[in-house]
Amino acid sequence: MTELKRRPLPHDFHPPVPSFTVTSEDVPEGGTLKDDQVHAAGNTSPHLRWEGFPAETKSFAVTCYDPDAPTGSGFWHWVVFDIPASVTELPVGAGSGAFEGLPQGAVQARNDYGSKGFGGAAPPPGDGPHRYVFTVYAVDQEKLGPDADGTPAFVGFNLRFHTIARAHLISEYEVPADS
C-alpha cells in the first residue's frame, strides 16, 4: 500500500486533545511488529507503558487498529477500556489468553475477529505494509459506558466524547505476496 493510498487514523476525525507518552518493549515506533504480535505466530498483546497524561484522568482505554485493512473501514485488533487511572502499564499478554495481566475492572470488547482480547496482525499476502496503531486514551470518567459486548465502533463513539488526552505508537507488518 503506497503512502498515497494510506487511510487516515480514526482519531484524525476527533477534536484535538493533548498528547502524552506511550512506550513499548514490543512495538517499535515506525518499525516492524514482532512475530509475537502476529496472528499466525505468537498472537500476544504487547507490553505498553504510558506517562505524562492529565492529572484529571479517571481511566484509560487501549486500542489496536489497522487503518489499511481492505475492508473499507479498517480492522480493530484490540479494544480494552475502564483501565483504572492508577494503572500505567500493561504487561505482555495482558489481552491474550486468560487476560491475567489486565487490571481488575478493565473490560475487553470484541475485536473484528469476533473475539474478546487481542488479535494479532494478519494483512493479506501481497497487500503491502499495514500500519498497526496502538493508542492509549486518557478518559474523563471511571466507567466509559459500553460493556464487553460493545462493538469497537460503539466504544470509539464513547471515546470521542470522553477522551481528554491520547498517545499512540505505530508499527507496520507485511506478508509478502508469495507467502
Swiss-Prot record:
InterPro entries: PEBP (IPR008914), PEBP-like_sf (IPR036610), YbhB_YbcL/LppC-like (IPR005247)
Superkingdom per UniProt: Bacteria
A Pfam short name: PBP
Composition bias, Basic and acidic residues: 1-14
Region (Disordered) location: 1-31
Similarity annotation: Belongs to the UPF0098 family.
Name of the featured protein: UPF0098 protein SCO1794
Species, as recorded: Streptomyces coelicolor (strain ATCC BAA-471 / A3(2) / M145)
Record lineage: Bacteria, Bacillati, Actinomycetota, Actinomycetes, Kitasatosporales
